[in-house]
From Swiss-Prot:
Renumbered ranges of motif CXCC motif: 64-67
Protein name in UniProt: Zinc chaperone YjiA
Gene transcribed to yield this protein: yjiA
Activation and inhibition: GTPase activity is inhibited by metal binding. Activity is decreased in the presence of Co(II) or Ni(II), and is completely inhibited in the presence of Zn(II).
Residues reported to bind GTP: 11-19, 161
C-alpha cells in the first residue's frame, strides 16, 4: 500500500490560503484530495459526522474531501484513515491548511513521531503563501511569518498585481530560505503540479534550487536566515558526524530545516541528509561518476551562529 502524499499549506493571515483552497476544491483536476482545514468556507457539501473523534468530514461534488480539525491533528489524520479503510471515503492526496499564526514545525513533526502516521502518510512538501503587499511589515513584526517561509519547499507570492515591483521582497525571501523556489499566484490560480511531488522531505541531490545572488542591502536583519555551506574537499564521515552532532546539541531549537549532499573521503557515492529540528536522516546516493565531487549544505534557522558553523566545517579540511 502506497503512503498518502501530504502537502502542508502555510502562510500568514491574509496571504491567500483560503483562496488557494477554494481553487483546489472547485477545480475539476482529477485528483482525489482530502483537505484538513480549521474552518469551512461557503461550499455546497453533504455534511456527515464520521468517527468517534467528532471530526467533521465533508465530501464535495468534485470528489475532494474537507475535514475540520477537532482537538488534535492526529485525531483528524487517523479519522481519515479509518474512513478510507472502511470504504466510506476515497482520497490519494492530503492538503493541510495551517492557521495564519501557526508554527509549521510541530505539524511537520507529527508525521515523523507517530508510528501509524509514518507508515500511512508521506509528507511531500510545505507550501508557504506570502502576501506581497504586507509581507515586509508582517515579517518585521512577527518572527512566525519568517518561520513559515523558512520551512517552505515552495513559496507562492500573492497580490503582486497590487504590490507591483517585488524584487527586494524576492531577495528577502531568498535570504530566509535559499532552498525554495518562488512562484507568483494570482487569485489562487496555479498549476497544482507546482504544489505536488516536491519531494521536500526525501533524500535528494537538489539541495539548493538556485544559489541566490543579492543586489540590495537588506533593510532589516531577518531573525530567520539561510546559511549555504559549500566544500570543495572530501570530509571524514566520523568528523562530519561530530560537527553535525555538536550543531544539533547547541542549536537544535534554532534549526528549522537543513539539507545536504556530502563528499565523503574514500567513498565513491554521495551521502545525502535532510532534517527538521532534531529529526534527521541520511543515506548513500548514487556514485559521483563524471561529476566533480563537492559538498553543499543549507541550514535554515533562527539567528544561527553562522561564523561558528562555517568554521566548524572549514576545520574538516585535511
Amino acid at each position: 500500500m502506497n503512503p498518502i502524499a501530504v502537502t502542508l499549506l502555510t502562510g500568514f493571515l491574509g496571504a491567500g490560503k483560503t483562496t488557494l483552497l477554494r481553487h483546489i476544491l472547485n477545480e475539476q483536476h482529477g485528483y482525489k484530495i482530502a483537505v484538513i482545514e480549521n474552518e469551512f468556507g461557503e461550499v455546497s457539501v453533504d455534511d456527515q459526522l464520521i468517527g468517534d473523534r467528532a471530526t467533521q468530514i465533508k465530501t464535495l461534488t468534485n470528489g475532494c474531501i474537507c475535514c475540520s480539525r477537532s482537538n488534535e491533528l492526529e485525531d483528524a489524520l487517523l479519522d481519515l484513515l479509518d474512513n478510507l479503510d472502511k470504504g466510506n471515503i476515497q482520497f490519494d492526496r492530503l492538503v493541510i491548511e495551517c492557521t495564519g499564526m501557526a508554527d509549521p514545525g510541530p505539524i511537520i513533526q507529527t508525521f515523523f513521531s507517530h508510528e501509524v502516521l509514518c507508515q500511512r502518510y508521506l509528507l511531500d512538501g510545505v507550501i508557504a503563501l506570502v502576501d506581497a503587499v504586507h509581507a515586509d511589515e508582517q515579517m518585521n513584526q512577527f518572527t512566525i511569518a519568517q518561520s513559515q517561509v523558512g520551512y517552505a519547499d515552495r513559496i507562492l507570492l500573492t497580490k503582486t498585481d497590487v504590490a507591483g515591483e517585488a524584487e527586494k521582497l524576492h531577495e528577502r525571501l531568498a535570504r530566509i530560505n535559499a532552498r525554495a523556489p518562488v512562484y507568483t499566484v494570482t487569485h489562487g490560480d496555479i498549476d497544482l503540479g507546482l504544489l505536488f511531488n516536491t519531494n521536500g522531505f526525501m533524500l535528494e541531490e537538489n539541495v539548493v534550487s538556485t544559489k541566490p545572488r543579492f543586489h540590495f542591502i537588506a533593510d532589516k536583519q531577518n531573525d530567520i536566515s539561510s546559511i549555504v555551506v559549500e566544500l570543495d574537499y572530501p570530509v571524514d564521515i566520523s568528523e562530519v558526524s561530530r560537527v553535525m552532532e555538536n550543531l544539533l546539541l547547541e542549536s537544535a531549537d534554532k534549526l528549522l530545516r537543513y539539507k545536504g549532499m556530502l563528499w565523503i573521503d574514500g567513498e565513491p557515492n554521495r551521502l545525502l541528509f535532510q532534517g527538521v529540528q532534531r529529526l534527521y536522516s541520511a543515506d548513500w546516493d548514487r556514485p559521483w561518476g563524471d561529476e566533480k565531487p563537492h559538498s553543499t549544505m543549507v541550514f535554515i534557522g533562527i539567528q544561527l551562529p553562522e561564523e561558528e558553523i562555517r568554521a566548524a566545517f572549514a576545520g574538516l579540511r585535511k
